[in-house]
Design a protein with these regions (language model features):
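Conserved hydrophobic/aromatic beta-strand scaffold that supports enzyme active sites
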Residues: 14, 19, 61-63, 113-115, ...
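Short Gly/Pro-enriched turn/cap motifs at secondary-structure boundaries
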Residues: 18-19, 51-58, 101-106, 112
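Glycine-rich beta-strand-centered segment in the early N-terminal region that forms part
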Residues: 20-34, 44-89, 125-128
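NAD(P)H dinucleotide-binding glycine-rich loop of Rossmann-like/cofactor-binding domains
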Residues: 85-150
């Protein structure tokens, strides 16, 4: 059973969900740490369009525990960091690569286990702790966007 938290009408609610087995192209990650950033606050404040009842938090880290068919970049045991725009892998921001983001249109990482597209995670160096890795995603994509898309 996975501990999962969702926000409904401003109230944080604990849910119990069975973790989904990964389908082709997906991975299951045991979430070991998550971090809150301004984006997460903005989602809850309504600055971004979000569906109701979404699992919040876009930045997190953990260990891969299972992979679906076709996943070649990650293996069980890998320490990974989340990518809150899992479909934005290169180039400028577009409607297609910003259509879904963790903690906004897709369930985020305030849960103990997450099954998501493999593109929602990147392998992280093992010399960092999960707590350290969880602080990097928003800062990293902000720096990447500033350097490479302007």
């Amino acid at each position: 059973m996975s501990n999962t938290y969702a926000i409904n009408e401003g109230v944080l609610t604990r849910l119990h969900r069975e973790p989904a087995a990964p389908l082709a192209g997906e991975v299951t990650v045991e979430i070991q740490a998550s971090s809150i950033n301004y984006r997460d606050l903005g989602i809850q404040a309504g600055f971004y369009p979000s569906r109701g009842g979404v699992v919040p938090i876009s930045d997190g880290a953990g260990r891969v525990i299972d992979i679906g068919d076709g996943v070649t970049d990650l293996v069980p045991g890998d320490l990974v960091a989340s990518c809150f725009f899992p479909f934005w892998e290169a180039g400028p921001a577009t409607a297609a690569n910003h259509c879904a983001s963790l903690g906004c249109e897709m369930d985020g990482l305030l849960r103990s286990t997450a099954t998501l597209p493999a593109s929602a995670f990147l392998r992280a160096p093992d010399y960092l702790s999960a707590s350290e890795v969880a602080t990097l995603p928003c800062a990293a994509v902000t720096a990447w966007a500033a350097l490479l898309t302007r």
